[in-house]
C-alpha cells in the first residue's frame, strides 16, 4: 500500500497523502476505514488524544492500550510524540480540511455506517464519544491513484471547476519525483511486497544498507511514538547509516545530496574505497585510482582524458590546485570530489600522461584538462627577436677566421717581396681603362655616407684614377676595386706575367710622377689612403726600391707582407705635418721592412678585410 502511494504523483506532505497514511496505519485506532472501504470513521476524543493533543509529561507506553475513550492520561501521553503531524490542535480545523478537499459527512444509520470498521484494537463501536463518518469518491481503500483528483476547493478553484477548467494539483517536488522514479524501477525488480513493522516494541534503528538507486524498500514505515515521521529515510550512500530526521508530515523532507558521476552511475554502484568508510564522504572515491584507473570524462561527443600537465610545464607552473577547467566543457563533468587532493605518485604510468619523479614533488597537484600542444616546448619560452632563418646580411658578417689565419701564414711563409711597377702612360691609353678608372671614383663617392662636400673633395682624384688604371697597360690583370665604406681604399691588381726590369730612366720618370701625385693629393684634406697591391712581380733592381716614395701617418700601420708591396698615399689635412721619407736607399728600405716584419700583423685589419669577402681576391688568383 505504501508502495502504491509513493508511485502516485502527489506531494507526500499534502493533506490527502497524510490522511491516506493515517488511515492505513495500524498504530492509530482513532481513524479507520468503514466497512465498505469507501469512507472514514473518526473517533473524535481518541483522535484528539492521539494526534491533536499537545505534548505532555506522561509516558507513551499506555497509548492505545485502552479500548474506551481517550481523554485520560494515556491519551495525553500518547500525543506527546507527534505534536506537529498537524499544525492545529483543534478538531474543528481538521474537519474543515476534510470539507475543503471535498469530503462529505455521512448521516449515522445510513448504509455507510453499518458498524465499526475492521480496525484492530477496537473494543467497541466508539460509544464513549462521537463517531464521524466522512465520504469522498476519490478516497477509497486500495486505490491511491484517486488521490490526484482531490483538489483544494478554494473560491478560485471552484470557479475553474464551474467553468469546466482543469485545476492542476501541486506538482511533486524534486524529492518526490526521485521517489516516483525509484519506486517504479524497484517495483519491477522486487519479488516480495513491502513488509510492515509491528507497533512499539521494536526500536527504530539503522536498517541494513542497500546499494543501487533509491528504492521503495529503503523507506521503512515506523509509527512509534518517538519517531516524528511515519517513515524514515535511509541514505543510499554506504557512508551514512543514520536516519534522516523529519519533523512532521506537513513538511517536505530535504533529500541528501546524491549526484550521478560522469559515468552515469549512482554512488552505490561505484566501488568505494574502504579508507573513507567512516568519513561520511557523500561522493565515492574510486578505488585503485593511482595505478589502474583510466578515468575518462565524456562531455557531449568528444572523449577527454584526465591527464596531468606536460612535464615541460612543471617548471613554469608551480600550482595546479586551483586550476579551472575549460569553459567548453560542462562543469557537471568535473566533480571536485573525485580528484580532490590526490598527489600523483611516481609510478602513475597507466594514465595518458608521462609522470616523472620531479613532478611528484608537488603534493597539491590536481589533474586538470590541458589543451593539446603541437610542440613540447612553449613558444613563449623563445626570445621575441629570435631569427627564423639566416639572412644574407648575417651570412656576410660571418668572418671565416680560418681564412684570415691562412692568409697570415702565407704572408710569413714566402721570402719574396714584390713591388708595383708604376708606368706613367700618355693619353693614348685605351678608353676602357680610363672609363674604368672614372667608374671607381663615383663608386667611392656613392659608397661614402658623407655629404656633398666629401664628393667635392674627391673630384681632384679623377686624373689620379686615370693614371692608376693605366699603370698596368699591356698586362693581363683583374682589378677588384669595389670600394668599401671604410676610409681606406684598397686596389688589388693582379698580373699574369712579370714586368721587365726597370731602368734608371724609368725610375726618374716614376719620381716625377710621385711628385705630381703628392702635389695633387696634399690639396685634399680627406684622411683616406689608397693602397695598390700587385703580386707575382720579381724584385728586380735597387733602383725600384729607391724610387718608391711613401707618406705615412705614425698613427697608422702599414700591412706587413713578404708577398705584397704597398704604395700608400695618405691624403691628410694641409696643415697636418707629414713624414716624407724622400728617396731612401735600398738598405734603409730593407731595414724598415725588416723592422715591420718583426711586428705582428694587425688582426683587426685582417678581420675587416675578411669581412668584405667580395673585395678580397680568391685563392686561385692569389696563387697565380
Swiss-Prot record:
Expression sites by tissue: Highly expressed in testis particularly in spermatocytes (at protein level). Not expressed in fetal testis and ovary.
DNA-binding region extent: 11-228
Key words of the record: Activator, Chromosome, Differentiation, DNA-binding, Meiosis, Nucleus, Phosphoprotein, Repressor, Spermatogenesis, Transcription, Transcription regulation
Principal cellular location given in the protein's record: nucleus
Gene inactivation effect: Male mice are sterile. Show impaired spermatogenesis and spermatocytes fail to progress beyond the pachytene stage and are consequently eliminated by apoptosis. Spermatocytes show aberrant sex chromosome remodeling and silencing.
GO-annotated molecular function: DNA-binding transcription activator activity; DNA-binding transcription repressor activity; sequence-specific double-stranded DNA binding
GO biological process terms held by the UniProt record: cell differentiation; male meiotic nuclear division; spermatogenesis
Region (Disordered): 52-77, 112-138, 186-214, 429-461, 572-605
Subcellular localization: Nucleus; Chromosome
GO terms under cellular component: nucleus; XY body
Membrane-spanning ranges: none
Modification Phosphoserine, positions: 600
Keyword set includes Transcription: yes
Residue pairs linked by disulfide bridges in the UniProt entry: none
A Pfam family assignment: HSF_DNA-bind
Gene3D superfamilies: Winged helix-like DNA-binding domain superfamily/Winged helix DNA-binding domain (1.10.10.10)
Low complexity compositional bias, start-end: 186-197, 442-457
Biased composition (Gly residues): 58-77, 112-127
Role description: DNA-binding transcription factor that is essential for male fertility, spermatogenesis and meiotic prophase progression in spermatocytes under non-stress conditions. Positvely and negatively regulates gene expression to ensure progression of meiotic prophase beyond pachytene stage in spermatocytes. Plays a role in male germline meiotic sex chromosome remodeling and silencing through regulation of SMARCA4.
Protein family according to the UniProt entry: Belongs to the HSF family.
Quaternary context: Homooligomer.
Protein name: Heat shock factor protein 5
Species assigned in the record: Mus musculus
Amino acid at each position: 500500500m505504501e508502495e502504491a502511494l509513493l508511485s502516485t504523483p502527489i506531494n507526500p506532505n499534502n493533506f490527502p497523502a497524510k490522511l491516506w497514511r493515517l488511515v492505513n496505519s495500524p498504530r492509530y485506532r482513532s481513524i479507520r476505514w468503514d466497512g465498505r472501504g469507501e469512507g472514514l470513521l473518526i473517533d473524535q476524543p481518541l483522535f484528539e488524544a492521539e494526534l491533536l493533543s499537545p505534548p505532555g509529561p506522561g509516558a507513551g507506553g499506555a497509548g492505545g492500550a485502552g479500548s474506551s475513550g481517550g481523554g485520560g492520561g494515556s491519551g495525553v501521553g500518547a500525543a506527546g510524540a507527534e505534536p506537529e503531524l498537524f499544525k492545529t490542535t483543534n478538531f474543528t480545523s481538521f474537519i474543515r480540511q476534510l470539507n475543503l478537499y471535498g469530503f462529505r459527512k455521512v448521516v449515522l444509520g445510513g448504509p455507510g455506517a453499518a458498524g465499526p470498521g475492521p480496525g484492530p484494537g477496537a473494543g467497541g463501536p466508539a460509544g464513549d464519544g462521537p463517531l464521524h463518518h466522512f465520504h469522498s469518491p476519490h478516497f477509497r481503500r486500495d486505490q491511491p491513484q484517486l488521490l490526484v483528483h482531490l483538489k483544494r476547493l478554494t473560491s478560485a478553484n471552484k470557479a475553474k471547476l464551474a467553468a469546466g477548467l482543469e485545476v492542476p494539483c501541486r506538482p511533486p517536488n524534486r524529492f518526490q519525483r526521485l521517489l516516483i522514479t525509484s519506486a517504479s524501477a524497484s517495483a519491477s525488480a522486487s519479488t516480495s511486497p513491502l513488509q510492515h513493522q509491528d507497533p512499539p516494541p521494536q526500536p527504530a534503528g539503522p536498517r541494513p544498507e542497500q546499494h543501487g538507486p533509491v528504492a521503495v524498500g529503503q523507506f521503512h514505515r515506523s509509527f512509534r511514538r518517538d519517531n516524528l515521521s511515519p517513515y524514515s529515510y535511509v541514505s543510499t550512500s554506504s557512508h551514512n547509516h543514520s536516519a534522516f530526521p523529519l519533523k512532521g508530515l506537513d513538511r517536505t523532507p530535504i533529500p541528501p545530496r546524491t549526484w550521478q558521476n560522469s559515468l552515469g552511475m549512482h554512488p552505490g554502484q561505484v566501488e568505494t574505497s574502504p579508507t573513507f568508510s567512516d568519513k561520511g564522504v557523500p561522493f565515492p572515491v574510486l578505488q585503485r585510482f593511482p595505478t589502474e584507473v583510466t578515468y575518462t570524462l565524456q562531455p557531449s561527443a568528444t572523449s577527454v582524458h584526465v591527464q596531468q600537465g606536460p612535464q615541460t610545464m612543471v617548471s613554469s607552473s608551480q600550482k595546479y590546485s586551483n586550476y579551472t577547467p575549460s569553459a567548453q566543457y560542462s562543469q557537471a563533468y568535473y566533480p571536485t570530489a573525485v580528484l580532490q587532493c590526490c598527489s600523483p605518485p611516481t609510478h602513475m604510468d597507466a594514465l595518458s600522461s608521462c609522470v616523472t619523479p620531479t613532478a611528484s614533488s608537488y603534493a597539491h597537484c590536481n589533474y586538470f584538462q590541458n589543451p593539446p600542444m603541437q610542440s613540447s616546448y612553449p613558444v613563449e619560452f623563445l626570445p621575441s627577436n629570435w631569427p627564423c632563418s639566416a639572412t644574407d646580411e648575417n651570412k656576410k658578417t660571418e668572418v671565416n677566421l680560418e681564412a684570415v689565419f691562412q692568409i697570415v701564414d702565407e704572408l710569413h711563409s714566402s721570402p719574396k717581396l714584390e713591388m708595383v711597377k708604376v708606368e706613367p702612360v700618355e693619353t693614348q691609353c685605351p678608353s676602357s681603362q680610363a672609363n674604368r678608372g672614372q667608374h671607381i671614383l663615383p663608386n667611392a663617392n656613392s659608397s661614402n655616407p658623407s655629404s656633398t662636400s666629401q664628393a667635392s673633395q674627391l673630384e681632384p682624384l679623377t686624373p689620379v684614377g686615370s693614371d692608376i688604371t693605366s699603370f698596368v697597360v699591356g698586362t693581363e690583370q683583374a682589378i677588384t676595386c669595389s670600394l668599401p665604406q671604410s676610409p681606406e681604399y684598397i686596389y688589388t691588381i693582379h698580373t699574369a706575367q712579370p714586368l721587365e726590369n726597370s731602368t734608371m730612366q724609368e725610375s726618374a720618370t716614376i719620381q716625377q710622377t710621385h711628385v705630381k701625385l703628392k702635389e695633387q693629393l696634399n690639396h685634399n684634406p680627406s684622411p683616406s689612403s689608397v693602397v695598390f697591391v700587385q703580386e707575382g712581380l720579381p724584385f728586380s733592381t735597387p733602383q725600384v726600391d729607391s724610387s718608391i716614395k711613401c707618406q705615412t701617418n705614425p698613427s697608422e700601420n702599414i700591412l706587413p707582407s713578404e708577398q705584397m708591396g704597398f704604395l700608400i698615399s695618405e691624403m691628410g689635412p694641409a696643415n697636418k705635418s707629414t713624414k716624407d721619407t724622400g728617396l731612401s736607399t735600398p738598405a734603409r728600405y730593407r731595414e724598415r721592412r725588416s723592422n715591420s716584419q718583426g711586428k705582428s700583423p694587425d688582426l683587426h685589419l685582417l678581420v675587416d678585410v675578411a669581412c668584405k669577402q667580395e673585395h678580397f681576391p680568391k685563392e686561385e688568383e692569389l696563387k697565380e
